[in-house]
Amino acid sequence: MKKAIIGRKVGMTQIFDEKGKVIPVTVVEAGPCVVVQKKTLENDGYEAIQVGFDEIREKLANKPRKGHFAKAGATLRRTLKEFRLDDISQYEVGNEIKADVFGAGDKVDVSAVSKGKGFQGSIKRWNQQRGPMTHGSKFHRAPGSMGASSDPSRTFKNKRMPGHMGSVNTTVLNLEVVKVIAEKNLILIKGGIPGPNKGTVVIKDTVRA
């Protein structure tokens, strides 16, 4: 059965396995999330659950959001996400989803908005090669040719050029859950995940299982 939860990236640390080997892990505060709405085949044409995360004060929500949460009988949340799961019959509006839906050894996909790097050149942004730094060269970190001359007389779409780097939704696949601390709603995931500390992350069962 597929599982999913919304969380907040706390940061990275390291733990030791039973053989004393160091394992780098990312700590995620996962949930508690509340089921705000159920989408059904009859009403919506597909089955899914809508989940809210991160409680907020009433003054931070507009009237439509307040009404949406009041209908569900749930407290106001900052983040809303929709998950298409195999079987939504076990979920009811108002139910809580906590970190213990996952267990040690589970394989997950983690999605988050990557760190923004601002405007960057093509060397940093696309890992292009630079020119010679000495021997009379005047070409160092410039992007180089944009394309051919009279034919086609334009730069092709998607040409790798300098521009805004980062701040895009990124997914890392097939990461391992090392440990779940249910009483603190913490999930420890092996390796790094996208985004800054305190950023919102979505954890789902991996598609590569």
UniProtKB/Swiss-Prot annotation:
Q: Where is this region: Disordered?
A: 128-154
Pfam families of this UniProt entry?
A: Ribosomal_L3
Residue ranges that the Swiss-Prot or TrEMBL entry lists as coiled coil: none
- The answer to keyword Ribonucleoprotein applying to this record is yes
Q: Which residues form the signal peptide?
A: none
Asked if the record carries the keyword rRNA-binding, the reply is: yes
What is one cellular component GO term in this UniProt entry? cytosolic large ribosomal subunit
Recite the UniProt keywords alphabetically. Answer: Ribonucleoprotein, Ribosomal protein, RNA-binding, rRNA-binding
Q: Which domain of life is it from?
A: Bacteria
Q: Name one GO molecular function term.
A: rRNA binding
Question: Which BP terms from GO are recorded?
Answer: translation
Job description of the protein: One of the primary rRNA binding proteins, it binds directly near the 3'-end of the 23S rRNA, where it nucleates assembly of the 50S subunit.
Q: What quaternary arrangement does the UniProt entry report?
A: Part of the 50S ribosomal subunit. Forms a cluster with proteins L14 and L19.
What the entry lists under NCBIfam families is as follows:
L3_bact
What family is reported? Belongs to the universal ribosomal protein uL3 family.
Protein name per Swiss-Prot or TrEMBL:
Large ribosomal subunit protein uL3
Lineage of the species this protein comes from: Bacteria, Bacillati, Bacillota, Clostridia, Eubacteriales
